[in-house]
Amino acid sequence: MIRLFRKTSLTTLTDEQLISRVGAEQDEKAFNELYSRHARRLMGFFLRAFRYDEDEAADACQETFMKVWQAAVQFDSSSAFRPWLYTIAYNLCRSRFRHSEQAERYRSEQLATTAETYEDSSELQLDNATLQLALASVLATFPQESRTLFALRFEEELSIKQVAQVLNIPEGTVKSKVHRLLCQLKQQLHDYE
């Protein structure tokens, strides 16, 4: 018997093809493939947003993927999946910060956590740990919007266009905010030394 159609391996499909399958067919295997591709990085995004509170980050990550499942049918197949995912994650962060008083607690805890990490670092990692400590300390003093912008652009490595989509602002605004943020970081890190 000759097979006219071959089963497509999910690993060869793009994120956009997978989310389209989730939306059209509620394909759990396609959803699981998306989860396996993006959960780790998304967890890292939430860990930074929630100041390394693993429980809060895990809850937010799970809630984001629940929202992805529920909203998959609304995904615009002409757009990219990753900015859409991070838009959901960003909006969830904003909502959680708006409805809680954790932001201040996280700022003070971040300094203590970073100092502990620094003390535990080995001699070989001393310079990197010093830089990471300084960067984390400086970023902890910045507003949530600036920390989110930094995370999306430099830690999640989204393009300017993708960051603009996630934050729902013009690309030019993203460019100017990134430039201003980098200038502020440069100045404060210079002052930190």
What are these regions (language model features)?
Residues 1-10, 52, 105, 134-137, ...:
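C-terminal edge and immediately downstream basic/flexible tail or linker adjoining helix-turn-helix-like DNA-binding
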Residues 3-7, 23-33, 43-63, 171, ...:
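Short, charged helix-capping/linker segments at alpha-helix termini
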Residues 11-16, 95, 103-128, 132:
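Internal acidic/polar
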Residues 23-24, 48-52, 63-80, 99-100:
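Sigma70-family region 2
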Residues 37-40, 48-50, 151-158:
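Short helix-capping/turn signature of helix-turn-helix
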Residues 59-66, 79-91:
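Structural recognition of an alpha-helix C-terminal capping motif at a helix-to-coil junction
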Residues 73-77, 87-108, 180:
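Arg/Lys-rich amphipathic alpha helix in sigma70-family domain 2
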Residues 135, 146, 152-155, 160-161, ...:
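DNA-recognition helix of helix-turn-helix
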